[in-house]
Structure formats: structure tokens, C-alpha cells
Amino acid sequence: MIKTTAMLLEELSEYGSPKSKLSRMAKRGEYFPIKKGIYETDRHTPAYLLAGSIYGPSYISFEYALSFYGMIPEAVYTVTSATFEKKKKKKFETVFGTFTYRDIPSDAFPLGIRLLQEGDYFYRIAEVEKALCDQLYTVSPLPNKKELFLHLTENLRIEESELKKLDTLKICEYSAAYHSTNIKKLCSLLRRL
């Protein structure tokens, strides 16, 4: 369970020095710091459940979400998340894993996000179409649809059969919010598959 320093200090208020007690408990592995002011009580909590608490507003996307949905064959160990108007990439290394955050356009940010629950944890993750749009937004403009198709199938290793399952209408609707030639080309490419 995620707890703030204030919550833990309140729980430890009967001790003479709650801050010292918290520090000792963290050193003994009873609490695990996620970032300054935030702790997790269970060392075995999957990293993706913590991503939204580290930096936000954010949601899981890019390679991690594509792997989550089985679009790309590789396992992704860094939890990749989308943010907006932060102006720079952020990276956090914790005992739970590595977390990276990067911007997408603010108009695109609220589109295509799912809120999921796992036990007592809630987390936000991009729908598969949105994760692919976010991923392509980070790529330098590709010259044509053929190069885009090669990028999708060779670099990202997405099977053509998986591309055909995507909701083309959603991607075409999302493309207006990104102002990205790659996403416009993806819309056009998917209409022809």
C-alpha cells in the first residue's frame, strides 16, 4: 500500500521521534521509499502499479503499454509513462524498477486512457491505439507509409495481423490532437491494410 510520509508519521506519533522511527523502519525494509515523501509497504508490488504515484499527472504508455497488450514481443522492464507540459523527460530509479516519463501534446493527453484496478491499487494505462500513437509521436518523421510500415514491423516488431486489429477510426481521431505526420500516416496506412 502506498503511504505518504505524513500518513506514516501520524501512525508513528506515539513514538518520541516518529521521523527517526520511520527512518529505522525503512532501513530494516519495513517501508520502501518510492520517491521523497512516498513509501510502499510491500516490496513485491509490481512497478506499474506505482508509476502514477511517482510523477504526474501521467499514465502508462509507449513500449510498456504495447508490451502489456501483447503488441510487441519483447518484455519491457522500464515502466514508460506519458505526461504533458513537463518540458523534459524524467527518469526515476527505485527498488521497484525504473520509471521514465515523457511529454505528449496536451490536447492528446486525456484521450484513450483506461483506469484499471488491481487489488487495492488503481492505475491509468493507454488503450493500445493510444500507446502506439504516443510511441510514434516520439519518432522522427518517417518519409512515407512504406517506411512507417517497416518501422512498425521491423523496429517495433509488431505483426501485420496485430495492426489489422487496431481501431483505425480511433487512431484517425487521435491524429488531430498530435499534429504528427507519423500518426496521420498511420491512419492512412491502417485504412489500406
Where is each model-derived feature located?
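Exposed, interaction-prone assembly regions rather than primary DNA-binding/catalytic cores
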Residues: 70-127
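Hydrophobic/aromatic-lined pockets within catalytic cores
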Residues: 13, 70, 137-141
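Short coil/loop linkers at secondary-structure junctions
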Residues: 15-18, 72, 181
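Accessory alpha/beta interaction modules
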Residues: 59, 63-75
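Short, compositionally biased low-complexity segments
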Residues: 25, 33-35, 102-109, 147, ...
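Residues at alpha-helix termini
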Residues: 27-28, 67-68, 177
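Short beta-edge/loop segments at beta->alpha junctions of small alpha/beta modules
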Residues: 1-63
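Hydrophobic alpha-helical interaction segments
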Residues: 113-193
